[in-house]
Design a protein with these regions (language model features):
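Active-site helix-to-loop segments that bind/position phosphate- or nucleotide-bearing substrates
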Residues: 129-331, 336-338, 342-347, 371, ...
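Short amphipathic alpha-helical interaction segments
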Residues: 291, 459-470, 538-549
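A short, conserved structural fragment
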Residues: 394, 472-482, 551-562
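Polybasic/polar functional segments that serve as interface/processing modules
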Residues: 1-51, 55-104, 111-113, 240
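Glycine-rich/acidic phosphate-handling loop/turn and adjacent ATP-lid/helix
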Residues: 327-372, 415-431, 499-505
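Short acidic, hydrophobic short linear motifs in intrinsically disordered regions
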Residues: 444-456, 524-535
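Intrinsically disordered, low-complexity regulatory tails
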Residues: 87-165, 315-316, 375-386, 390-405, ...
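Short, cationic-aromatic polyanion-contact patches
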Residues: 482-514, 559-583
Length: 583
């Protein structure tokens, strides 16, 4: 880790007043704290992180230092290698910071096939942790089981269901399924009778139905697994039931039957409860639902198809919850395999927890349609994001916490009138459409990081990084979390000012002009950009932007032509500002 990265991380910790999901600081003057094992396990099981030894959180992250950094490095490396299973290999180093030695370790996330990381001394169940916000939480036995299942290909959907026979199948679904198989996969299925074809497709295991076969083509799977269903609840308030009049819900549906029927019933319930919006199209008007149906269909299918079907989860249903400000779809079991929150939406990214179920549903259509339930091409979430973009809505927020996965759809137009007026009040010229979308997301109180920005705008990571960096340089955004774990918030003087009115938000306070601040910092001396950042506390990108402005105006000059050189220094010219000349 570079010194500048460490300084930025510590500045963020001090600004936040506490640790966060990707950074843990501990006072460790002479020995490793006992809780280090938990933190190392948590980082390795989540998204990786940075451990800083020698910072005292109780004293505002004061650099108290480490007395013998070489020994501390060796002790930490030995603990990672000998006390944790599998052994961890973090990047460990010492930095001199504010007169104290800090030992810094960068812990990478383990690949799915190696999780969970746990403390050997207490065993896998008691010694496995996960990072939640700024703390380390012990994994539940169910979460440990899911991580172990991710080490290979789960086979829960292939298991035979005791007491079932071919008579428990929906024969209309079976006829359509076999017809498609014989048409699309004639070499494998054309010459097989019904029983043989169902066995080859793994709908039948011997004389019993597989779990996948029962769920996809069964007449009533809930006869054997009552909770393998979908529930839909429409709540009257943002927090759920309305305590003022005792209304618990506006609508409540239990969707049962095979997966095609559950998807169909869920969409019927959603249509019944969604508001319609009128939009102008050409010379006429069109009625649209408040959420695009394509996005909802993909989300419901994903939840039913990619959920955990291990025995431990058979008592948990897929939940769809509608609130006035959002729609939440949640399923048991987090993301599987190589899929991560950061690559959701990347075309072709796919890992199938329930491979047999997916294969069957490729040739199982929705009721009254020729469209298959799923394509099994990793295209579901990209289609979901595209539908939300086309509808000018904010992208869904995805959350993976190992034991469950959820998609939350905000109920507002991304570039509504209030957001457009606020962005215009910033008086920033040359913003791209995607930058305006990113600002609008923060205006609506949503989380903004590189992934969310890409999802909202269909950009690659490089372009997203450049555009977010430009917003930082303009003084509109403030990065937090360090480079690797960066997320963004609105700068204080760019945020909409609070207002007592329930109408439009007041325009932001006028953002500071940094020219005088930088000129004062220069004085009669020369300084590098890094020197000026240290003196003023401005972000490096913001400093770069204002130095460019001052150079263009002739108020400063550079000592070298190559402004990219870290050695270039700046000094004031004889030209004076309007304030200084009294103009």
């Amino acid at each position: 880790m570079l010194y500048d990265d460490l300084a930025e991380i510590i500045a963020n910790l001090r600004g936040l007043g506490g640790d966060h999901a990707f950074v843990e600081a501990k006072r460790a003057e002479s020995k490793l704290p006992k809780s280090v094992r938990e933190t190392l396990s948590a980082f390795a099981n989540t998204s990786g992180g940075v451990l800083i030894l020698g910072l005292d959180e109780t004293q505002g992250f004061e650099a108290t230092g480490v007395r013998d950094p070489a020994k501390m490095e060796a002790d930490l490396a030995a603990l990672c290698s000998e006390n944790l299973e599998p052994p961890l290999r973090p990047l460990i180093g010492t930095h001199r910071f504010e007169g104290a030695d800090l030992v810094v370790a960068e812990i990478p996330e383990l690949p799915p096939g190696s999780k969970p990381s746990f403390n050997r001394g207490v065993g896998m169940t008691q010694g496995s942790f996960v990072r939640v916000a700024d703390g380390d939480r012990r994994l539940s036995p169910y979460e440990v089981q899911l991580m172990m299942a991710n080490r290979g290909q789960p086979r829960d959907d292939e298991q035979p269901v005791a007491g079932t026979t071919i008579a428990n199948l929906d024969h209309a679904l079976v006829d359509t399924f076999l017809s498609r198989l014989r048409r699309h996969r004639s070499r494998a299925f054309a010459n097989l009778d019904t029983t043989a074809a169902l066995r080859r497709a793994k709908v039948l295991v011997g004389t019993e139905l597989s779990l996948a076969g029962l769920l996809a083509l069964g007449e009533y799977p809930q006869e054997f697994f009552p909770q393998l269903m979908l529930t839909f609840v429409h709540y009257p308030t943002k927090s759920g039931p309305d305590p003022r009049n005792g209304t618990r819900f506006i609508d409540n549906v239990a969707a049962e039957g095979p997966i095609p029927v559950m998807v169909d019933e869920a969409l019927i319930a959603l249509r019944r409860n969604m508001k319609r919006r009128s939009t102008v199209r050409g010379a006429g008007r069109a009625e649209t639902y408040e959420y695009p149906e394509t996005a909802l269909r993909e989300a419901v299918v994903n939840a039913l198809v990619h959920r955990d079907y291990s025995g431990t989860s058979h008592g948990t249903q897929v939940q769809v919850e509608m609130y006035p400000d959002r729609l939440l779809i949640r399923n048991p079991g987090g993301l599987y395999g190589s899929v991560r929150e950061e690559n959701l939406g990347v075309e072709g990214t796919s890992s199938a927890r329930n491979a047999t179920l997916l294969k069957i549903l490729e040739d199982t259509p929705l009721p009254g349609s020729d469209r298959p339930i799923c394509e099994n091409r990793g295209s579901g979430i990209p289609a979901m994001l595209a539908a939300m973009r086309d509808a000018k809505l904010s992208p869904p927020r995805f959350a993976d916490d190992i034991s469950a996965f959820s998609a939350t759809f905000p109920n507002h137009t991304l570039m509504g009138d209030d957001a457009v007026r606020w962005i215009a009040s910033l008086d920033e010229h040359g913003l791209t459409d995607s930058q305006c979308h990113g600002l609008a997301m923060l205006f609506h109180g949503e989380t903004l990081n590189n992934q969310a920005y890409r999802n909202a705008n269909d950009l690659d990571s490089r372009v997203a990084t450049e555009e977010l960096g430009d917003l930082v340089a303009r003084g509109l955004l403030v990065p937090a979390g360090g480079r690797r774990y960066a997320h963004y918030t609105l700068a204080e003087d760019a945020a909409p000012a609070p207002t007592d009115s329930t109408d439009s938000p007041a325009p932001p306070k006028r953002r500071a002009d940094r020219r005088e601040e930088i000129l004062d910092a220069l004085g009669d001396d020369e300084a590098t950009r890094a020197d000026l950042v240290a003196v003023t506390g401005l972000h490096d990108r913001t400093m770069t932007r204002w130095l460019t402005v001052l150079l263009r105006q002739g108020l400063i000059e550079a000592t070298e032509r190559n402004l990219r050189s870290p050695n270039v220094r700046y000094r004031r010219t004889s030209k004076r500002t309007l304030d200084e000349t009294g103009g």
